[in-house]
UniProtKB/Swiss-Prot annotation:
It catalyses: a quinone + NADH + 5 H(+)(in) = a quinol + NAD(+) + 4 H(+)(out). Its main location: membrane. GO terms for cellular component: NADH dehydrogenase complex; plasma membrane. It comes from Nitratiruptor sp. (strain SB155-2). It is a multi-pass membrane protein. It is found in: Cell inner membrane. The keyword DNA damage does not apply. The keyword Membrane applies. PANTHER family: NADH DEHYDROGENASE SUBUNIT 4L-RELATED, NADH-UBIQUINONE OXIDOREDUCTASE SUBUNIT ND4L. Belongs to the complex I subunit 4L family. The gene is nuoK. This is NADH-quinone oxidoreductase subunit K. Gene3D superfamilies: 1.10.287.3510.
Length: 100
């Protein structure tokens, strides 16, 4: 039987992987992927708590997080494509050369 602890351990492992990905990567596309993994880890935890307590609030929050993440990906990838067309690279170090 899968308990709440199993879901929370899975969520913590996924969030740790995402945190390492966010801190270690220099590629902006990989940063987007790591952010999505972190959001999905939070969704798993929210859905698990929702199932455990018998309340739909956690599932509603997870649904809204999925909707916000989809819009984040749409805007972020659009900006990333424009950045790649102008600079030819999507490395994080290339963002330091922005003139303000």
């Amino acid at each position: 039987m899968i308990t709440l602890t199993h879901y929370l351990i899975l969520s913590a492992i996924l969030f740790s992987i995402a945190l390492v990905g966010i801190l270690r990567r220099k590629n902006l596309l990989m940063l987007f992927f790591a952010t999505e993994i972190a959001l999905n880890a939070v969704n798993i935890a929210l859905a698990a708590f929702s199932k455990y307590y018998g309340d739909l609030t956690g599932q509603l929050f997870a649904f809204f997080i999925i909707a916000i993440a989809a819009s984040e990906v749409a805007v972020g990838l659009g900006l990333l494509i424009i950045w790649y067309k102008r600079r030819g690279t999507i490395d994080l170090d290339s963002l330091q050369s922005m003139n303000g």
